[in-house]
Amino acid sequence: MSRQPTTTKKPKPLSKKKKPVSISKLKNKLWEECKRIIRARYQREDGRWDCFTCGAIIEEPKDCHTGHFIPSSTGGALLRHHLHNLRPQDYRCNINGGGQGAEFYRRLVETEGQEYVDNLFRLKHQTVKADRWWYEQKILEYKEILE
């Protein structure tokens, strides 16, 4: 009896379906939209920015941080990406100074009013289901702002 050579099966090609974008990639994409909006909204006519907390002039976009009034660690997904909670800051205030919360508060009350700030504190206690749909909707909403 002669043996037939064994044939190895070719692996099936992987399906052509695209994997859904991960939530972490959606978070990053939403954060990029937030930064674009804040930079556009608070840019001076000469193309520079003022640090919201110390008033220093920020020359380059790479040096213009988007700082949080209520830190993202305590504000959750809602305030992490809420445009009312964000302002331009320089590196020194945002990173070295931990966001300069007291000065941020004072300036926010001065420029927007106490009711505005109180509303942000109310939002701090709201929870949202930050799932894929929520991030996708926010990205679409924020893209429309700059168009």
Residue ranges of model-derived segments:
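A boundary/linker detector
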Residues: 1-37, 42, 56-57, 120-147
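Conserved aromatic-histidine-acidic binding/catalytic patches
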Residues: 26, 78, 96
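A general structural signal for well-ordered alpha-helical packing
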Residues: 31, 35, 39, 48-51, ...
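Immediate flanking context of iron-sulfur cluster ligation sites
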Residues: 39-45, 78-83
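Histidine-centered nuclease catalytic patch
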Residues: 50-86
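Short Cys/His-centered divalent metal-binding micro-motifs
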Residues: 56-59, 83-113
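Short microdomains enriched in Cys/His and/or Lys/Arg
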Residues: 72-85, 109-124
